[in-house]
From Swiss-Prot:
Hydrolase as UniProt keyword: yes
Gene Ontology MF terms in the entry: ATP-dependent peptidase activity; ATPase binding; serine-type endopeptidase activity
Name under which the protein is recorded: ATP-dependent Clp protease proteolytic subunit
Active site: 114, 139
Subunit (UniProt): Fourteen ClpP subunits assemble into 2 heptameric rings which stack back to back to give a disk-like structure with a central cavity, resembling the structure of eukaryotic proteasomes.
Cited CDD domains: S14_ClpP_2
Function summary: Cleaves peptides in various proteins in a process that requires ATP hydrolysis. Has a chymotrypsin-like activity. Plays a major role in the degradation of misfolded proteins.
PROSITE patterns hit by this protein: CLP_PROTEASE_HIS, CLP_PROTEASE_SER
Chief location category: cytoplasm
E.C. designation(s): 3.4.21.92
Organism, scientific name: Aromatoleum aromaticum (strain DSM 19018 / LMG 30748 / EbN1)
Keywords, sorted A to Z: Cytoplasm, Hydrolase, Protease, Serine protease
Length: 212
Protein backbone atom coordinates (compact mmCIF):
# COMPACT_ATOMS: atom_id res chain seq x y z
CA UNK A 1 0.00 0.00 0.00
CA UNK A 2 1.53 3.24 -1.08
CA UNK A 3 0.41 6.15 1.06
CA UNK A 4 2.58 8.80 -0.58
CA UNK A 5 3.13 7.87 -4.22
CA UNK A 6 1.30 9.73 -7.00
CA UNK A 7 -2.02 8.19 -7.93
CA UNK A 8 -1.23 7.42 -11.56
CA UNK A 9 -3.17 5.01 -13.72
CA UNK A 10 -1.78 1.94 -15.42
CA UNK A 11 -0.68 2.10 -19.07
CA UNK A 12 -2.81 -0.96 -19.71
CA UNK A 13 -6.06 0.31 -21.24
CA UNK A 14 -8.03 -2.56 -22.79
CA UNK A 15 -10.94 -0.27 -23.64
CA UNK A 16 -8.71 2.16 -25.51
CA UNK A 17 -7.01 -0.72 -27.31
CA UNK A 18 -10.34 -2.14 -28.43
CA UNK A 19 -9.75 -5.44 -26.63
CA UNK A 20 -12.94 -5.50 -24.53
CA UNK A 21 -15.49 -8.01 -25.89
CA UNK A 22 -18.93 -6.76 -26.85
CA UNK A 23 -22.19 -8.54 -26.04
CA UNK A 24 -25.19 -8.08 -28.34
CA UNK A 25 -28.64 -8.66 -26.85
CA UNK A 26 -31.90 -9.04 -28.74
CA UNK A 27 -35.10 -7.48 -27.47
CA UNK A 28 -38.47 -6.42 -28.81
CA UNK A 29 -36.92 -3.04 -29.58
CA UNK A 30 -34.09 -4.54 -31.60
CA UNK A 31 -30.43 -5.14 -30.79
CA UNK A 32 -28.35 -3.48 -28.12
CA UNK A 33 -24.59 -3.85 -27.71
CA UNK A 34 -22.78 -3.67 -24.36
CA UNK A 35 -19.12 -3.97 -23.52
CA UNK A 36 -18.70 -7.03 -21.32
CA UNK A 37 -18.16 -5.02 -18.12
CA UNK A 38 -21.31 -2.96 -18.62
CA UNK A 39 -23.26 -6.14 -19.23
CA UNK A 40 -21.91 -7.68 -16.02
CA UNK A 41 -22.75 -4.47 -14.15
CA UNK A 42 -26.39 -5.21 -15.00
CA UNK A 43 -25.89 -8.44 -13.03
CA UNK A 44 -24.42 -6.38 -10.13
CA UNK A 45 -20.86 -7.58 -10.80
CA UNK A 46 -18.01 -5.06 -10.53
CA UNK A 47 -14.25 -5.46 -10.85
CA UNK A 48 -11.02 -4.17 -9.36
CA UNK A 49 -8.31 -5.27 -11.78
CA UNK A 50 -4.83 -3.78 -11.49
CA UNK A 51 -3.51 -1.08 -9.16
CA UNK A 52 -5.71 0.79 -6.69
CA UNK A 53 -5.55 4.46 -7.67
CA UNK A 54 -7.83 7.48 -7.91
CA UNK A 55 -9.13 6.45 -11.34
CA UNK A 56 -10.11 2.91 -10.37
CA UNK A 57 -11.50 4.09 -7.02
CA UNK A 58 -13.70 6.69 -8.70
CA UNK A 59 -15.11 4.09 -11.09
CA UNK A 60 -15.77 1.53 -8.36
CA UNK A 61 -17.37 4.06 -6.00
CA UNK A 62 -19.65 5.26 -8.81
CA UNK A 63 -20.70 1.69 -9.61
CA UNK A 64 -21.40 0.90 -5.95
CA UNK A 65 -23.59 3.98 -5.59
CA UNK A 66 -25.39 3.23 -8.85
CA UNK A 67 -26.16 -0.35 -7.83
CA UNK A 68 -27.46 0.85 -4.47
CA UNK A 69 -29.82 3.24 -6.26
CA UNK A 70 -30.97 0.43 -8.57
CA UNK A 71 -31.78 -1.98 -5.74
CA UNK A 72 -30.70 -1.28 -2.14
CA UNK A 73 -31.64 -4.80 -0.99
CA UNK A 74 -29.72 -6.91 -3.52
CA UNK A 75 -26.09 -7.99 -3.07
CA UNK A 76 -23.19 -6.55 -5.05
CA UNK A 77 -20.47 -8.95 -6.28
CA UNK A 78 -16.99 -7.42 -6.17
CA UNK A 79 -14.24 -9.35 -8.01
CA UNK A 80 -10.67 -8.42 -7.03
CA UNK A 81 -7.41 -9.08 -8.89
CA UNK A 82 -5.06 -6.36 -7.66
CA UNK A 83 -1.49 -5.83 -6.43
CA UNK A 84 -2.71 -2.97 -4.21
CA UNK A 85 -1.85 0.70 -4.43
CA UNK A 86 -2.87 4.00 -2.88
CA UNK A 87 -4.21 3.93 0.67
CA UNK A 88 -6.41 7.01 0.21
CA UNK A 89 -7.94 5.58 -2.97
CA UNK A 90 -8.52 2.25 -1.25
CA UNK A 91 -10.16 3.98 1.70
CA UNK A 92 -12.60 5.68 -0.68
CA UNK A 93 -13.68 2.24 -1.91
CA UNK A 94 -13.70 0.76 1.60
CA UNK A 95 -15.82 3.53 3.11
CA UNK A 96 -18.33 3.30 0.27
CA UNK A 97 -18.58 -0.48 0.70
CA UNK A 98 -19.45 0.04 4.36
CA UNK A 99 -21.73 3.02 3.65
CA UNK A 100 -24.12 1.57 1.09
CA UNK A 101 -27.07 -0.57 2.09
CA UNK A 102 -26.47 -3.63 -0.16
CA UNK A 103 -24.13 -6.32 1.12
CA UNK A 104 -20.89 -6.45 -0.85
CA UNK A 105 -19.66 -9.98 -1.54
CA UNK A 106 -15.94 -10.05 -2.38
CA UNK A 107 -14.13 -12.67 -4.46
CA UNK A 108 -10.39 -12.88 -5.16
CA UNK A 109 -9.37 -14.01 -8.63
CA UNK A 110 -5.61 -14.17 -9.24
CA UNK A 111 -4.24 -12.05 -6.42
CA UNK A 112 -5.32 -9.66 -3.71
CA UNK A 113 -2.25 -7.96 -2.28
CA UNK A 114 -1.76 -4.96 -0.02
CA UNK A 115 -4.85 -2.72 -0.35
CA UNK A 116 -6.39 -5.42 -2.55
CA UNK A 117 -6.36 -7.88 0.36
CA UNK A 118 -7.74 -5.20 2.69
CA UNK A 119 -10.74 -4.66 0.40
CA UNK A 120 -11.18 -8.42 0.06
CA UNK A 121 -11.45 -8.77 3.84
CA UNK A 122 -13.86 -5.81 4.00
CA UNK A 123 -16.66 -7.70 2.24
CA UNK A 124 -19.77 -8.90 4.05
CA UNK A 125 -18.93 -11.59 6.62
CA UNK A 126 -19.90 -14.99 5.23
CA UNK A 127 -19.74 -13.66 1.66
CA UNK A 128 -15.98 -13.28 1.16
CA UNK A 129 -14.47 -15.84 -1.19
CA UNK A 130 -11.39 -16.70 -3.21
CA UNK A 131 -10.70 -19.17 -6.00
CA UNK A 132 -8.35 -22.11 -5.32
CA UNK A 133 -5.18 -20.76 -6.95
CA UNK A 134 -5.51 -17.14 -5.88
CA UNK A 135 -2.87 -15.55 -3.65
CA UNK A 136 -3.30 -13.05 -0.85
CA UNK A 137 -0.65 -10.77 0.67
CA UNK A 138 -0.81 -8.34 3.58
CA UNK A 139 1.81 -5.82 4.69
CA UNK A 140 2.22 -2.37 6.21
CA UNK A 141 1.65 0.79 4.14
CA UNK A 142 4.62 2.07 2.16
CA UNK A 143 5.64 5.70 2.00
CA UNK A 144 8.34 7.84 0.50
CA UNK A 145 8.87 11.57 1.04
CA UNK A 146 11.69 14.01 0.40
CA UNK A 147 12.07 17.46 1.87
CA UNK A 148 13.04 19.27 5.05
CA UNK A 149 13.66 17.18 8.14
CA UNK A 150 10.61 18.61 9.90
CA UNK A 151 8.37 17.72 6.94
CA UNK A 152 9.79 14.20 6.78
CA UNK A 153 8.99 13.80 10.48
CA UNK A 154 5.39 14.93 9.89
CA UNK A 155 4.93 12.44 7.07
CA UNK A 156 6.53 9.65 9.10
CA UNK A 157 4.02 10.26 11.91
CA UNK A 158 1.20 10.23 9.36
CA UNK A 159 2.32 6.88 7.93
CA UNK A 160 2.56 5.39 11.43
CA UNK A 161 -0.95 6.62 12.17
CA UNK A 162 -2.26 5.12 8.93
CA UNK A 163 -0.55 1.83 9.73
CA UNK A 164 -2.15 1.66 13.19
CA UNK A 165 -5.59 2.46 11.75
CA UNK A 166 -5.31 -0.15 8.99
CA UNK A 167 -4.16 -2.78 11.49
CA UNK A 168 -7.17 -2.06 13.72
CA UNK A 169 -9.55 -2.36 10.78
CA UNK A 170 -7.96 -5.57 9.51
CA UNK A 171 -8.18 -7.04 13.01
CA UNK A 172 -11.90 -6.21 13.08
CA UNK A 173 -12.58 -7.88 9.73
CA UNK A 174 -10.43 -10.98 10.27
CA UNK A 175 -10.99 -11.59 13.98
CA UNK A 176 -7.22 -11.76 14.54
CA UNK A 177 -5.73 -10.09 17.65
CA UNK A 178 -4.24 -6.69 16.89
CA UNK A 179 -0.84 -7.94 18.10
CA UNK A 180 -0.92 -10.72 15.50
CA UNK A 181 -1.88 -8.29 12.75
CA UNK A 182 0.98 -5.96 13.72
CA UNK A 183 3.45 -8.85 13.62
CA UNK A 184 2.20 -10.27 10.32
CA UNK A 185 2.07 -6.93 8.48
CA UNK A 186 5.57 -5.90 9.57
CA UNK A 187 6.84 -7.68 6.43
CA UNK A 188 5.12 -9.09 3.36
CA UNK A 189 2.94 -12.02 4.45
CA UNK A 190 1.83 -14.23 1.56
CA UNK A 191 -1.07 -16.67 1.86
CA UNK A 192 -2.65 -19.39 -0.21
CA UNK A 193 -6.42 -19.50 -0.61
CA UNK A 194 -6.68 -21.97 2.28
CA UNK A 195 -4.38 -19.81 4.43
CA UNK A 196 -6.60 -16.78 3.76
CA UNK A 197 -9.62 -18.71 5.04
CA UNK A 198 -7.76 -19.76 8.18
CA UNK A 199 -6.60 -16.18 8.76
CA UNK A 200 -10.11 -14.77 8.40
CA UNK A 201 -9.56 -12.67 5.28
CA UNK A 202 -12.09 -14.77 3.37
CA UNK A 203 -14.77 -17.20 4.49
CA UNK A 204 -14.53 -19.93 1.86
CA UNK A 205 -12.56 -21.20 -1.13
CA UNK A 206 -14.80 -21.72 -4.16
CA UNK A 207 -13.85 -24.45 -6.62
CA UNK A 208 -16.97 -24.16 -8.78
CA UNK A 209 -20.16 -22.14 -9.04
CA UNK A 210 -22.13 -24.68 -6.99
CA UNK A 211 -19.95 -23.91 -3.94
CA UNK A 212 -21.10 -20.28 -3.77
Amino acid sequence: MNSAAPHGSSNWDPVGLGLVPMVVEQSGRGERAYDIYSRLLKERVIFLVGPVNDVTANLIVAQLLFLESENPDKDVYFYINSPGGSVSSGMAIYDTMQFIKPSVSTLCIGQAASMGSFLLAAGEKGKRFCLPNSRVMIHQPLGGFQGQASDIEIHAREILGIRAKLNEMLAKHTGQPIEQIEKDTDRDRFMSAADAVEYGIVDKVLTNRADS
